[in-house]
Every structure is written in C-alpha cells, then in structure tokens.
Regions:
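Cleavable N-terminal targeting peptides that direct proteins into the secretory/outer-membrane pathway or into
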Residues: 1-38
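Acidic, small-polar-rich N-terminal luminal/periplasmic segments of exported/outer-membrane proteins
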Residues: 3, 39-193
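Short, flexible loop/turn elements at secondary-structure junctions
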Residues: 18, 22-24, 129, 203, ...
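Short secondary-structure transition/capping segments
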Residues: 123-127, 238-239, 275-276
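Outer-membrane beta-barrel translocator/receptor signature
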Residues: 146-148, 157-160, 171-248, 254-262
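Acidic/polar loop-and-plug regions of large Gram-negative outer-membrane beta-barrel proteins
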Residues: 232-236, 248-255, 259-311
C-alpha cells in the first residue's frame, strides 16, 4: 500500500509570513517615531551691517565713507576724485609716531623728505610739495595755518582717520597745491563705553603713555564725552636731538534728536623738544667721501643748542 501524502499549505504560510513581517515593521516604525524627540524650529535672521560715518570709526581697515571729497558724508566710490583713508585701526597696527608715517603706504604720497625726522608732516602728493603757507594739511575740513617752522602737527593717536585726496581741490578748499591735500579727522564722543590705557616703549629710548575714554553721560545718550591724551619722549636718530610731546583732546557732543548733534572739539599740545629737522648731502651718506669713509648714521650737522619748542 502506497504511503499517503499530506498536503502542505505553502501559499497560506507565505501569506502569514508577509503579514507578520508587515506587522513587525509597522511596530518598529511606530516605536522609532515614539522614541525620537520632536525637532525644534530655529529661526535665523541677518542683522544689518553697522552704518559707517565719514567722521567716525570704520567697520574694517578699508573705509567706505568720506567727507573730504564733498564735505558731506558720501560713499568713496561715488566721489569723482581719488581718495585714500588710513583708519585708526590701521594706525594701531603700524604704531606711527607721526601722521606722515601713517601715510607711508599711501599711493602717490612721498613722506621721506627729511629722512627719519617727525618734526613736520610735510608731504609730496603727486610730485607737488606743500609746506609753509601753502601746506595742504586740514583738520576736520579746516586748514591748519602755518609758516614753515610753526606749522601745526597733530599726533596720530588723536585721530580717527587720515585721508588723502589727490588732484586739484581749490573749488572746495580755496588756495591749495595741485597735488592734493591731507584731511585729518579727530576722534569724537561715542555712546558706547570706551576705556583704553596704553604704555609703549621702543628703540631710541621711546617711552609713551596714552589714554582714551568715552561714554554717554546720561541713559538716553543725549550727552556724551571723549577724552584722549598722551605723553611721549624719545631720542632722535641723530645725536643731541630729543623729541617730547604732551597732548590732550577733550570733546563733548549734544544730541537733542536723531537728526541733530552739536560736537565741541578741542586740542592742546606742547612740545618742549621737536627733534631733528636737518638733512645730509649724498656725499658721505649714499656715496663715500674722498677719503673713502661715510658719515655715521647718527651724525648731527647742527649745533648742540639748535633746538626749539612748539605749542
């Protein structure tokens, strides 16, 4: 007798397996969804860039606004003349002892007319020298009057900007050298607290201390002040010459409303010693003398009492 065969329900088993797998998959998805926390929504907003003023600090080393070309707060790219701006941030990086040192990297400007001397800020702009009564140095848009030896000199630590405008400027500034002009912008009061004290020492017995304070005088920022000062002494490169300078610049601002402000600026400076202001010929410096020797780098051709003060 042949053995009987038992029927195997293959299709039923497959259906059961599919149903079980689907159920397990659904349970795992449900469990995963239950475990994962709900994601929070993050909203990102872009803050507007700080508005730069032609009389205030620049957001970066490269300034975008200037008042030298039009005497108004104007973007530099809209001024039809060539303008270069050296900001206070750039001066802090280079630590110049004079404005002409701060302008030593400015195109079209020659500052080494008297070697290492910092007695005056005499510049040659586009080949035109301006000194004495024809000097083209301005402070806050006003010409610094002088007569060569009593030319006014502003310390770079007191400035927010030093701006060079190249080319003829007599339409805006009257009598001037055709090469261009230098306009310096003083530091002005801020409503944000500013507290800075510096001590500096360097070669040639350089010692300098300075301070810069500014803040609002009331909660609304209607009244604000700024007080900047320094004291510096150093030996010049030449023997027997010394530099001494004391300066202070109090400033006060009144802002009755958002569109109106009155700023009082003052500057006091005393220089008991103005340093060396001479020059040496090519013979003996660049080229040797007939005996084959050269003058020492600290040679001073002037007399021991050939000094003067300025204030």
């Amino acid at each position: 007798m042949a053995p009987s065969k038992t029927a195997q329900p293959k299709h039923s088993l497959r259906k059961i397996a599919v149903v079980v797998a689907t159920a397990v998959s659904g349970m795992s998805v449900y469990a995963q969804a239950a475990v994962e926390p709900k994601e929070d929504t993050i909203t990102v907003t872009a803050a507007p860039a700080p508005q730069e003023s032609a009389w205030g600090p620049a957001a970066t080393i490269a300034a975008r606004q200037s008042a030298t070309g039009t005497k108004t707060d104007t973007p530099i790219q809209k001024v039809p003349q060539s303008i270069s701006v050296v900001t206070a941030e750039e001066m802090a990086l280079h630590q110049p002892k004079s404005v002409k040192e701060a302008l030593s990297y400015t195109p079209g400007v020659s500052v080494g007319t008297r070697g290492a001397s910092n007695t005056y800020d005499h510049l040659i702009i586009r080949g035109f020298a301006a000194e004495g009564q024809s000097q083209n140095n301005y402070l806050n848009g006003l010409k610094l009057q002088g007569n060569f030896y009593n030319d006014a000199v502003i310390d770079p630590y007191m400035l927010e900007r030093a701006e060079i405008m190249r080319g003829p400027v007599s339409v805006l500034y009257g009598k001037s050298s055709p090469g261009g002009l230098l306009n310096m912008v003083s530091k002005r009061p801020t409503t944000e607290p500013l507290k800075e004290v510096q001590f500096k020492a360097g070669t040639d017995s350089l010692f300098q201390t300075g301070f810069d304070f500014s803040d609002a005088l009331d909660d609304d920022g209607v009244y604000s002040y700024r007080l900047t000062g320094l004291a510096r002494s150093a030996n010049a490169q030449q023997k027997g010459s010394e530099e001494q300078r004391y300066a202070i610049a109090p400033a006060f601002t009144w802002r009755p409303d958002d569109k109106t402000n009155f700023t009082f600026l003052s500057y006091f400076q005393n220089e008991p010693e103005t340093g060396y202001y001479g020059c040496l010929p090519k013979e003996g410096t660049v080229e040797p003398l007939p005996n084959g020797k050269r003058l020492p780098t600290d040679f001073n051709e002037g007399a021991k009492n050939n000094t003067y003060s300025r204030n």
